C-alpha cells in the first residue's frame, strides 16, 4: 500500500505498508521524529516510521504480553527483542531537513563500527557490509520529503531503497547480507541509545495495545490509524 504524500506541515505514515519486493504488508508499530535541541529550540531532522510483520504480535506476546506501554518503553530488552525478533521489520525515514547520503551513512555506520569494535564483534564481514552501505548512499542527496526505506529480514539481510516522496516502490533496492548491520540500523533508531525517543514511545504504546488484544486463537491482522508527524 502506498503511503500518503508528504506536505509542508506534516509527514504521514499510513497504518500499513508493503516493503519493496515483500510478499505482504506490515502494520505500523510506531512513529516519531529524530531531532536535537539547539539554542533552546528542538530542531527536527527526520520523521521515522517502524513497521512490523503480523508475526511480531504472537512472537512478542510470549514474553511481553500483559505489560503496559510504560513498562515496555522503559525496558531496553523489549526493544532488543523487536530488533532481533524472528519477523520482518520495515523502517521508513523521511527527511524534514535536507541531508546528503554520505552524511547519513557516515553517522549511522560510525556508531555501529565503534560499538562492534568495543565489543570485539568487528570482522572483515562487517567491514565489507559497511563499505557497501556507504556506497549505496554516496550518490544520494535527500531533499525534504525524500525517504530512505530499510527492510530488515529475520535472516539478516538489510535491503536499502529510496523514494522521492513518502511513497514506497513495489520493488527495487540493494540487499546487504550482514546480520549485525541489519540489526544495528534498527537498533540505532529504537535501541537503548536510539535516535528517536518519540518513535520508541509510540512503538511501546502500539505494541502494548496489540499484545493486550492477542489471544491464543490468533486475532485478525492488526490495524492502526495513520500517524501524522508535525514538521
UniProtKB/Swiss-Prot annotation:
SUPFAM superfamilies, per database record: Chalcone isomerase
Residues the entry annotates as binding substrate: 46, 111, 188
Record-annotated membrane-spanning stretches: none
Enzyme class per UniProt: isomerase
Keywords, ordered alphabetically: Flavonoid biosynthesis, Isomerase
Endpoints of the signal sequence: none
Site (described: Important for catalytic activity): 104
Biological processes per GO annotation: flavonoid biosynthetic process
Tissue localization of expression: Pericarp.
A Pfam family per the record: Chalcone
Coiled-coil regions, chain positions: none
Family matches, as Gene3D superfamilies: 1.10.890.20, 3.50.70.10
Catalytic reaction equation(s): a chalcone = a flavanone
Highest taxon of the lineage: Eukaryota
EC number from the UniProt entry: 5.5.1.6
Pathway field: Secondary metabolite biosynthesis; flavonoid biosynthesis
GO MF annotation list: chalcone isomerase activity
Role: Catalyzes the intramolecular cyclization of bicyclic chalcones into tricyclic (S)-flavanones. Responsible for the isomerization of 4,2',4',6'-tetrahydroxychalcone (also termed chalcone) into naringenin.
Misc. comment: Part of the biosynthetic pathway for all classes of flavonoids, a large class of secondary plant metabolites, many of which are brightly colored.
Similarity remark: Belongs to the chalcone isomerase family.
Protein name as annotated: Chalcone--flavanone isomerase
Highest classification ranks of the organism: Eukaryota, Viridiplantae, Streptophyta, Embryophyta, Tracheophyta
Gene name of this polypeptide: CHI
Amino acid at each position: 500500500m502506498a503511503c500518503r504524500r508528504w506536505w509542508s506541515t506534516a509527514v504521514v505514515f499510513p497504518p500499513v505498508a508493503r516493503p519493496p519486493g515483500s510478499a505482504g504488508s506490515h502494520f505500523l508499530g510506531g512513529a516519531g521524529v529524530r531531532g536535537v535541541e539547539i539554542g533552546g529550540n528542538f530542531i527536527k531532522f527526520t520523521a521515522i516510521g517502524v513497521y512490523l510483520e503480523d508475526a511480531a504480535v504472537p512472537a512478542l506476546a510470549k514474553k511481553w504480553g500483559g505489560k503496559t506501554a510504560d513498562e515496555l518503553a522503559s525496558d531496553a530488552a523489549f526493544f532488543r527483542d523487536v530488533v532481533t525478533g524472528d519477523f520482518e521489520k520495515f523502517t521508513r525515514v523521511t527527511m524534514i531537513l535536507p541531508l546528503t547520503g554520505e552524511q547519513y551513512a557516515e553517522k549511522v555506520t560510525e556508531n555501529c563500527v565503534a560499538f562492534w569494535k568495543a565489543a570485539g564483534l568487528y570482522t572483515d564481514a562487517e567491514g565489507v557490509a559497511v563499505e557497501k552501505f556507504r556506497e549505496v548512499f554516496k550518490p544520494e542527496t535527500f531533499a525534504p520529503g525524500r525517504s530512505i526505506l530499510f527492510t530488515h529480514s529475520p535472516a539478516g539481510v538489510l535491503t536499502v531503497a529510496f523514494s522521492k516522496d513518502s511513497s514506497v516502490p513495489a520493488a527495487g533496492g540493494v540487499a546487504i547480507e550482514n546480520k549485525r548491520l541489519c540489526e544495528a540500523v534498527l537498533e540505532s533508531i529504537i535501541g537503548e541509545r536510539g535516535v528517536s525517543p518519540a518513535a520508541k514511545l509510540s512503538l511501546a504504546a502500539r505494541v502494548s495495545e496489540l499484545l493486550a488484544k492477542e489471544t491464543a486463537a490468533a486475532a485478525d491482522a492488526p490495524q492502526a490509524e495513520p500517524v501524522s508527524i508535525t514538521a
